[in-house]
From Swiss-Prot:
Cross-referenced InterPro entries: DesT_TetR_C, Homeodomain-like_sf, HTH_TetR, HTH_transcr_repressor_FabR, Tscrpt_reg_HTH_FabR
Organism annotation: Salmonella paratyphi A (strain AKU_12601)
Organism lineage string: Bacteria, Pseudomonadati, Pseudomonadota, Gammaproteobacteria, Enterobacterales
Function of the protein: Represses the transcription of fabB, involved in unsaturated fatty acid (UFA) biosynthesis. By controlling UFA production, FabR directly influences the physical properties of the membrane bilayer.
Subunit structure as annotated in this protein's UniProt entry: Homodimer.
Name of protein: HTH-type transcriptional repressor FabR
Length: 210
């Protein structure tokens, strides 16, 4: 990559980070202005268009980055699990760390999941589906269950995790610790339920084949 391309990528990165920094519990992406983001990034508003077509393209890039960041962290968690440790507890801890370190990234996913923009809703749905698919892949590999079972289990787990994540954004450290424990219990109940449901279905098949 040449010097000019590196500088362009650096400026593009600055715009993304500037937009993230302006999000908060009180401020959504829809309330951001191009001028504010450009000023925070240290560039002229007219220079913004060298990097993004419009503010919506910037927002969609932020959604993609947020989803990718979360998936990468969860992959790292699964690598740690491979070396020993509780699958569910390690995953929950990693997820809560992500929210603690990147609250605005998670807020963006939550808000735009049910926002007014169809493009944003589709982008968030796509990221969540990636998340579900990767978890289903892992469960299928580890638990040796059919894809239909692991997808249903993964979808239930992700739904509960995202709901807990929304709650975690606005509570203190002790409440978050209690939330983590509750989330671990809920996910274990889903995992146990999926396993016993699968066992029951297998027993039915075996009985019919006799």
């Amino acid at each position: 990559m040449g010097v000019r391309a590196q500088q362009k990528e650096k400026t593009r990165r600055s715009l993304v980070e500037a937009a993230f920094s302006q999000l908060s519990a009180e401020r959504s992406f829809a309330s951001l202005s191009l001028r504010e983001v450009a000023r925070e990034a240290g560039i002229a508003p007219t220079s913004f268009y060298r990097h993004f077509r419009d503010v919506d393209e910037l927002g969609l890039t932020m959604v993609d980055e947020s989803g990718l960041m979360l998936r990468q962290l969860m992959r790292q968690a699964r690598q740690r699990i491979a070396k020993g440790g509780s699958v569910i507890r390690t995953s929950v801890s990693t997820f809560m760390e992500f929210i603690g370190n990147n609250p605005n990234a998670f807020r963006l996913l939550l808000r735009e999941r049910s926002g007014t923009s169809a493009a944003f809703r589709a982008a968030v749905a796509r990221e969540i589906q990636h998340f579900i698919a990767e978890l289903a892949d892992y469960l299928e590999l580890e638990n040796h269950m059919p894809r239909a079972f692991t997808e249903a289990q993964a979808e239930a787990m992700v739904t509960i995790v995202f709901s807990a994540g929304a709650e975690a954004l606005d509570i203190g450290a002790e409440q978050r610790r209690q939330l983590e424990e509750r989330l671990v219990l809920q996910l274990r109940m889903i995992a146990k339920g999926a396993y016993y449901w699968y066992r029951r279905e297998q027993e039915k098949i075996a009985q019919h084949s006799e």
